[in-house]
Amino acid sequence: MNKVFPLWVKTPRSIRALMPDVLWQMPTKDKVLYLTFDDGPVPEATSFVLAQLEKYNAKATFFCIGDNVRKHPDIFQQVVNAGHTVANHTMHHISGWELSEEAYLEEVKLCQEILSQSLAAMANGGTKKSTKLFRPPYGKLKPSQYRKLKNSYQIVLWDVLSYDFDLNLSGEIVADSVIQNVEQGSIVVLHDSVKAFPRLQVALPKILQYYAERGWKFASIV
């Protein structure tokens, strides 16, 4: 039986051209993959991700929801202590299309503040700074929000979307669709969320093993 893969796994160049200031893919010809995880930290999913990454000495970028950082400071600390990059995914994960420019910028500001405060409160976090990386929830921004934010943050979207949040897909399909679309420097979106976890726990080990066996490295965006 033929596998049915989701559409739009690979971001078309025509879409990238609409927002040239966005980081879609890292500029490298080396065999390096940039795994990113949205919507954490949450206890079970994020802890699983950290354990899997450690097996392969892999680094990644975690786009954190500010409210989840507030709820789970211990998990956030584990992410930082493991040497991963933490970045802004707004305070409450609301689509930019649903908020005014002012309200959306406040969502971003609140998340940035809690990231900075959480890092400063850590015993070894005094020298760590929260990054100025930002990923909009759902990848959705109004033009006015985009114009404002690109002056203060490096907006990061993706080259490959895993669709691990899709309840109709299996973890195997998620892994295979990522593997078929990755190239050097690809930024891949996965989710350390409760919703995505049933697929993530199948897909992530397969992705890590596949690329590690072929000599790839896994790096964070800095």
Regions found by a protein language model. Give the residues of each.
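Active-site beta->alpha N-cap acidic-glycine motif
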Residues: F5-W97, A103, L110, I114, ...
